[in-house]
Amino acid sequence: MLRSLVGAEMCIRDRFQVMSVAEAAEKADIIHILLPDESHGAVYEAEIKPHLKAGKTLCCSHGFAYVFNTIVPPADVDVIMVAPKGPGTEVRRVFEEGFGCPGLIAVHQNPSGKARDVALAMAKAEGLTRGGVLECTMAQETYEDLFGEQNVLCGGLVDLMKYGFETLTEAGYPPEMAYFECVHEAKLIVDLIYNGGIQKMNSVISNTAEFGEYYNGPQILPAEVKERMKESLKRIESGKFAKDWLEEAAKGAPNLKAKREALGQHPVEIVGAKIRSLFERN
């Protein structure tokens, strides 16, 4: 189930069989859908649903389509989730190193009684059991994943970086230095947290930096932010976010495209491209 001809050519080069979604759905015992969330419903109805029968398994790596009912599977089909906690490039990299990303599994429907075994087998084949696998429900994974993306990892972090960059440059500081301080160095801090936790990170940075964390952090992100996060979680759990996103996607995603265009013109991206070019190796 590929996005482009280029993707198909890559699969052929890597000696995978390439076929239409409908043909794959007809032949496969396990149908693992890895398309964008907003496309699942239409592809399922047109090309997968007609080929489902008892004993087959539907699999996903994010529960959006099942939790928000863009896919409503028949009762005689197993439905599972196998979700690596990392992008595909990272999953492949650590697999080739002989380890694996951690992951999640979920059983949404289990008429065969074997759905959990299949989910664990797929997780093992992807190397996830070497990294550690947690069992959850599709709803838990979907709500928490959307919450983390919107409030911390993407929405929260990106806006925090942009505001920091804008504050320094508007005060007359060189944009290159502002980029280093507010964007580039974020990876260094996140890597420390990733490898040892927040307390370990604090033990590595300077006492001045740690004191500044406690001194100014609560002023920049006061307790009111947590209340706004609670409202965000309610919008996710109620289905409002999913409804708004699916309606946006059905119109061709004009607002999303406009935001992408605006971000591409933001000084933080223009300066960032120049900074990153300094680290390119010829």
What positions do the PLM features span?
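Single conserved hydrophobic/aromatic residue that forms the stacking wall/gate
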Residues: M1-G7, I12
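Small-residue helix-packing motif on alpha-helices
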Residues: A8, A24, P174-Y179
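Glycine-rich, highly charged phosphate/nucleotide-binding loops
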Residues: D14-E23, G86
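Rossmann-fold dinucleotide-binding core
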Residues: C59-Q150
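Interdomain hinge/lid region at the active-site interface
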Residues: D159, Y163-E166, E170-A171, G196-L256
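Small-residue-rich helix-loop
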Residues: P175-L188, G196-G197
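N-terminal charge/polar-biased segments
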Residues: A249-N282
